[in-house]
Amino acid sequence: SDISGRAGFGARLGAYLLDFVLYGFVLAIPVIAGALVILVPIASNCVSVPGSDEIVCPPGVPSGSSVAGGVALIVLGILGVIFIYVRAEGKTGQTWGRKIVGVKVVRVADGQPPGFWRAFGRELFGNVISGQILYLGYLWMIWDRDRQTWHDKVAGTIVVKV
């Protein structure tokens, strides 16, 4: 099949690395906030025991609510970033990194963006399966005549130049 419009390995890797950095910065906000909600009460109320590695905290520090609140911030942050990422891929075929590099994900059948649930399945499969065996599922596009990764094949998508 004609692969002239398909994105190559370098462009896809570049987009992936940009996404990793850009979405990572966004994710850092709730992760840091959540960690602070948990750690500030410890830092301000607990003391180290001289001559040992032990730290002594007053009863209730950290409180269950501060730990729960911090964990909730972190979990909601992770879910929020996943939603933003998958929504962008599903709606336009482009994440921030793909937009910068000039590539997008489209359905093989009609060349349209994949839609939310197909994008979600593609990313889930990609993150869970494609990277498990020496990243073979990602590298597969180097040898594949259609330049598809395993998760592209499962989702019925290709990555094209814009």
Task: Name these PLM-found stretches.
Residues 4-16, 20, 82-102, 113, ...:
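Juxtamembrane cytosolic face of transmembrane helices
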Residues 1-24, 46-57:
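Helix-coil boundary and N-terminal low-complexity module in membrane systems
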Residues 34-46, 91-92, 96, 100, ...:
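Membrane-interfacial segments
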Residues 27-78:
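Membrane-helix interface segments in multi-pass membrane proteins
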Residues 107-109:
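Short, acidic, Ser/Thr-enriched surface-loop or helix-capping motifs
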